[in-house]
């Protein structure tokens, strides 16, 4: 599916969520993935995934590295590990830290009418 589709599915399943903002710079990528993105190498399903979600994305193409945008549509993601925490739930992050479980905060909840803003 890709990260963007997993994120959109979370929006659809939770009526109390209005929208999301994802920061491309905060998405952890392996060095090999960065090389592939910089060389415009993408998976065979990348375009189909992009086309299925593009109407739900708000992207300012002048402010992002458009090559890195493809990481949102690559089906080789662990979308099952994508979750949304209320800002008051710091104790969950503290527990992850305590157990030395790596995580990355890649965005936030917004009021963007079931859209995902990519920054």
Regions found by a protein language model. Name each.
Residues 1-119:
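Glycine-/charge-enriched secondary-structure boundary and capping motifs
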């Amino acid at each position: 599916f890709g990260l963007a589709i997993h994120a959109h599915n979370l929006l659809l399943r939770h009526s109390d969520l209005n929208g999301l903002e994802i920061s491309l710079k905060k998405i952890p990528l392996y060095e090999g993935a960065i090389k592939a993105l910089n060389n415009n190498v993408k998976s065979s399903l990348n375009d189909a995934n992009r086309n299925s979600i593009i109407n739900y994305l708000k992207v300012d193409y002048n402010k992002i590295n458009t090559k890195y945008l493809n990481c949102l549509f690559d089906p080789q993601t662990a979308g099952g590990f994508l979750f949304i925490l209320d800002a008051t739930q710091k104790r969950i992050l503290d527990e992850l830290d305590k157990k030395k479980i790596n995580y990355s905060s890649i965005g936030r909840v917004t009021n963007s009418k079931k859209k995902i803003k990519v920054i």
